[in-house]
């Protein structure tokens, strides 16, 4: 059986959401958001950086959420969540799988600057720069979603899961209402049962560990 190491509403939510969409049996190892656990010798033997996600399939281990998405979609092609080699949308699909991490990098940097770095070490310049970069990354999606419900013309895919998680995070950091097509898209994604099943029990759409902050001005 597949096994997923996961921390609530971190990037590993992409992998959990995808597994829930696939509706296949798997074991969830719910890790605390605690460096003493994540950097323990036991977990470093699973993931060399002590991060999530990590997918275990028998003797095979895989980390990086984009790689896990490609692996699962190729292993379970009947799901139609991937776009395999012969599919004309294959490279668009790959583009958005990887673009989701472009978005997440800026969001993660902004989270560090606003909440996790000691106040004396924070940089208002870096925070503003990363906020603008995140806004630009989201803005790219706005025209894409004018005439479609999902990123690909053919419909929902794992690419929407990758980008959807990044938007779920961005929603706590910037004003998504400025991008109405994107805001409606995120609402559609959040309405999916597999998305809701990937949230911590009792959670709302807000990321449970991330305080609400003032949007970038």
Can you say where each PLM-predicted feature lies in the sequence?
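Short, flexible loop/turn segments with low-complexity composition
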Residues: 84-85, 197-205
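Residue-level signal for nonpolar/aromatic packing positions in well-ordered secondary structure
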Residues: 19, 55, 68, 141, ...
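GST-like fold's C-terminal all-alpha helical module
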Residues: 100-191
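Active-site-flanking alpha-helical
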Residues: 73, 166-167, 199
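Conserved beta-strand edge residues that scaffold enzyme active sites
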Residues: 33-34, 159, 203
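GST-like domain detector, emphasizing the conserved glutathione-binding G-site
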Residues: 1-125
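Acidic/histidine-enriched, glycine/proline-rich intrinsically disordered or flexible terminal extensions
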Residues: 202-217
């Amino acid at each position: 059986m597949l096994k997923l190491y996961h921390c609530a509403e971190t990037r590993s939510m992409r992998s959990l959401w995808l597994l829930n969409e696939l509706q296949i049996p798997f074991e969830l190892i719910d890790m605390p958001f605690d460096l003493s656990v994540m950097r323990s010798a036991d977990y470093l033997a699973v993931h060399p950086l002590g991060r999530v996600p990590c997918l275990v399939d028998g003797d095979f281990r895989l980390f990086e959420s984009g790689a896990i998405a490609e692996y699962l979609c190729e292993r379970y092609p009947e799901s139609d969540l991937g776009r395999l080699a012969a599919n004309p949308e294959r490279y668009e699909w790959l583009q958005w799988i990887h673009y989701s991490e472009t978005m997440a990098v800026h969001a993660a940097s902004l989270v560090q600057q606003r909440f996790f770095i000691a106040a004396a070490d924070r940089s208002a310049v870096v925070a503003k720069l990363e906020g603008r970069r995140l806004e630009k990354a989201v803005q790219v999606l706005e025209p894409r979603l004018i005439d479609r419900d999902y990123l690909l013309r053919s419909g929902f895919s794992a690419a929407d899961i990758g980008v959807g998680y990044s938007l779920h995070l961005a929603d706590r950091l910037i004003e998504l209402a400025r991008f109405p097509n994107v805001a409606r898209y995120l609402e559609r994604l959040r309405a999916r049962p597999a998305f809701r099943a990937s949230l911590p029990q009792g959670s709302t759409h807000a990321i449970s560990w991330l305080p609400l902050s003032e949007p970038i001005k």
